[in-house]
Design a protein with these regions (language model features):
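Bacterial Sec-dependent N-terminal signal peptides
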Residues: 1-26
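Periplasmic c-type cytochrome electron-transfer domains
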Residues: 19-339
Length: 339
């Protein structure tokens, strides 16, 4: 059960879809995979898992291969769809054999910059996070050791693994290859980026510019969603409910101050990632803005930042329009990142 495993390394969904059985040869590195957007930090690859095309190609194949799941039908890409900025459009993504999920699948865009993983931050590295969906009963419901044995019977996977890490498929290879691929899911070419970082003053509409001023000003969204990735990675209770079914970070550390506090998500590509919140309970961006405009519901751990905003109807529209301007269409149409 997820709650039991979270104490060890946490939870989050991975992704999937089937790939060709042929073993492709590593090619030269396309610029789209390594270029860092203006205003972004450099990506830090861990020692022993630095980027190269052999690792990336293996990771991509594994990411979209449903062989990772017990029933052979669910992959990382099943819950993290490229055209949705590697998120899903349902409240809870089904796992192997249709097992119901318990949390909304977050976007994986810019996951390379996250300092910890899962909604309660219980996993310190991207490589470790890969283990979570593999063994969760309501996700892949399998075992990484058994999975490695299955992959070791596939000659094409053996060849790709040797090219990438000079060893046959094993838990080390599986976790590192998928993480290597996921670190290239970089999104930083939205209308906002063109306006703010590249100086194209026509990139945002007049309404979106009003929304931008609200975001960083009156609405103070940037207090939680600041920085180039539109998150400070803090843990907050946003007053979604007076009583939450999900204990949030509390189930990791048993600290009552963390009851129903969750990691603040990035807002990049947020127009594509509905439904919203940890449980997918809000269906539209307007619903989200109205929730914060009303100041949320009473909860003893509600963030002090959550208070009535007193936005007019026109200001709500402008703020939503600005959030739509965070969509990176080049990211979601990049064929290199698709199956």
């Amino acid at each position: 059960m997820r709650a039991a495993f979270i104490i060890l390394i946490g939870g989050l969904s991975c992704l999937a879809i089937s790939c060709a059985k042929d073993s492709p040869q590593p090619a030269s590195i396309p610029g789209q995979l390594t270029d860092i957007p203006e205003g972004f930090d450099e990506i830090k690859y861990p020692s022993g898992n630095e980027f190269n095309m052999a690792r990336w190609m293996l990771g991509k194949r594994l990411f979209f291969d449903p062989i990772l799941s017990a029933d052979g039908n669910v992959s990382c890409g099943s819950c993290h769809k490229p055209h949705l900025a590697f998120s899903d459009d349902v409240a809870f993504s089904p796992g192997a054999n249709g097992a119901p999920g318990t949390r909304n699948a977050p976007s994986l865009a810019n996951v390379a910059y996250h300092p910890y993983f899962t909604r309660e931050g219980g996993v310190p590295t991207l490589e470790m996070q890969i283990l979570v969906p593999i063994q969760e009963h309501n996700e892949f419901n399998t075992n990484i050791v058994e999975l490695a044995e299955i992959l070791s019977k596939d000659q094409s996977y053996i060849e790709m693994s040797q090219a990438a890490y000079e060893r046959n498929p094993d838990p080390y290879v599986i976790t590192r290859a998928i993480a290597n691929f996921e670190r290239t899911l970089i999104s930083g070419n939205s209308a906002f980026d063109q306006y703010y970082y590249l100086g194209n003053k026509m990139a945002l509409s007049s309404v979106q510019k009003i929304g931008l001023d609200l975001f960083f000003g009156k609405a103070n969204c940037s207090s939680c969603h600041g920085g180039f990735n539109f998150t400070q990675y803090a843990f907050e209770n946003n007053g979604l409910y007076e009583s939450f079914d999900d204990p949030g970070r509390f189930r990791l550390n048993r600290d009552s101050a963390d009851l129903s506090r969750f990691k603040v998500p990035s807002l990049r590509n947020v127009a594509l990632t509905a439904p919203y919140m940890h449980d997918g309970s809000l269906l539209s961006l307007t619903d989200v803005v109205e929730h914060y405009n009303e100041g949320g519901k009473n909860h003893p751990n509600k963030s002090s930042q959550i208070k009535p905003l007193h936005l007019s109807e026109g200001e709500v529209i402008a703020l939503v329009s600005f959030l739509e301007g965070l969509t990176d269409y080049s990211f979601i149409t990049n064929k290199l990142l698709q199956p």
